[in-house]
Amino acid sequence: MLVSAKEMLEKARAGKYAVGQFNINNLEWTKSILLTAQELNSPVILGVSEGAGKYMTGFKTVAAMVSAMIDELNITVPVALHLDHGTYEGCYKCIKAGFSSIMFDGSHYPIEENIDKTKELVKIAHAMGLSLEAEVGSIGGEEDGVVGMGECADPNECKAIADLGIDFLAAGIGNIHGKYPANWQGLNFEVLENVKKAVGDMPLVLHGGTGIPADMIKKAISLGVAKINVNTECQLSFAAATRKYVEEGKDLQGKGFDPRKLLAPGAEAIKATVKEKNGTVWLRWQSLKIKQISQNKLVQYKILFLKNHFSNFKRNGLF
């Protein structure tokens, strides 16, 4: 059963460790990450970008696939299904589709508009039992074709967003999506310290976890980071393993062209990457019970949600 990411991240923040968000792109990605999390007895957050959601034919398909896979694989560790860098409209669609957590990325809006939209989504997400992540200070690099220069967040703006009742906050501190260039200056810990002072005990999120040195990761955790996102590293390991399989001609041996065999090395490479991350301090897991959302409670949430927010759904073309 899917759970909100709120409790797992609050416990990570208090325990000074971090939970990993690994983005999924298809069935192989999802299966590999879930099986590895179960093997390691570790909670996990499955991130889904809007581009990946579209690739998998829509958020409803993603939610159904993940929920069914959790059941069929007998996954018992806490799993959150989380929209990554969601638009205002995308957040509504994921709420309706059955996600258990959403991220609204309003960092490209003027702060006043970011506050207004975040405030509305907080009320709706919480009415449905979902956790909500917000962002201040755009993350650099490329995400689904959108290239951001990256900037450091304003601690005062972080406090304004945090005070809206969000569950965790992504603050730009010099981190970027994708591969880090050779001239990257590293994480800005002065900004992170000031953000921590401004938002108190709120769990912080570090996007662009691929390629950040372990010592920086550990320091970031000591300053309040409780969720670290990884996507590019899994993609690179999948591509390298698949390339090796083809270059060695294994796809031409027997029925090596069968997709179940062709994609297997890449799937195993994803497992190895997730294990590697879970083996570091930043993904240390303590065996804690995470509250799950019961079906009866979900029905109650949905009734309340429809009563209070029908006009918002109608306005966004979701009814």
Which ranges hold each PLM region?
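Low-complexity, intrinsically disordered or signal/transmembrane-proximal segments
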Residues: 292-295, 300-301, 309
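C-terminal alpha-helical cap/extension of soluble enzyme domains
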Residues: 213-293
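Short, conserved beta-strand segments within well-ordered enzyme catalytic domains
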Residues: 21-23, 43-47, 80-82
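Glycine-rich beta-to-alpha transition loops that act as phosphate-gripper elements at the mouths
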Residues: 24, 81-87, 203-214
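Alpha/beta enzyme core
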Residues: 5-9, 27-51, 59-76, 88-200, ...
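N-terminal amphipathic alpha-helix/helix-capping segment at the start of soluble metabolic enzymes
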Residues: 1-20, 67
